[in-house]
Swiss-Prot record:
Located on the platform of the 30S subunit, it bridges several disparate RNA helices of the 16S rRNA. Forms part of the Shine-Dalgarno cleft in the 70S ribosome. Residues 7-17 have a biased composition (Basic residues). This is Small ribosomal subunit protein uS11. GO terms for biological process: translation. One of its GO terms (molecular function) is rRNA binding. The keyword DNA repair does not apply. Residues 1-23 are annotated as: Disordered. Pfam families: Ribosomal_S11 (PF00411). PANTHER family: 40S RIBOSOMAL PROTEIN S14/30S RIBOSOMAL PROTEIN S11. Keywords: Ribonucleoprotein, Ribosomal protein, RNA-binding, rRNA-binding. The gene is rpsK.
Length: 133
């Protein structure tokens, strides 16, 4: 009796190299984490990184240094696809906002414009209680 196989054997899909010169960097900086997504002009994600994905855990994810490392990792992966210039969109109140932008520039990406797209409620849901630090 032949040995049973568990479904089809899947080959790892090779990432195809897109050639994109201009893109957008979306930086979402919360009190707990920083997520950097780099997209093409249509919004399709080329690369992303977060403070947790880069190796930081717990309260260290919310530091500016973690945001810097996440932005560098996302920028390196995006440059492999030929990205040279980005427009930056920053969202959220976190501590890693400026650091992430600076590290995108330091990684070799040319920053065209910086926009703050933090959503502001027009008296919608009740916000969480005030932080006591």
């Amino acid at each position: 009796m032949p040995p049973k196989t568990r479904g089809a054997v899947r080959k790892p899909r090779k990432k195809d190299k897109k050639n994109i010169a201009l893109g957008q960097a979306h930086i979402k900086s919360t009190f707990n984490n920083t997520i950097v997504s780099i997209t093409d002009p249509n919004g399709a994600v080329i690369s992303w990184a977060s403070a947790g994905e880069v190796g930081f855990k717990g309260s260290r994810k919310s530091t500016p240094f973690a945001a810097q490392m996440a932005a560098e990792a996302a920028a390196k992966r995006a440059q492999e696809h030929g990205l040279k210039k980005v427009d930056v969109f920053v969202k959220g109140p976190g501590s890693g906002r400026e650091t992430a932008i600076r590290s995108l520039q330091a990684a070799g990406l040319e920053v065209g414009s910086i926009q703050d797209v933090t959503p502001a409620a027009h008296n919608g849901c009740r916000p969480p209680k005030r932080r006591r630090v």
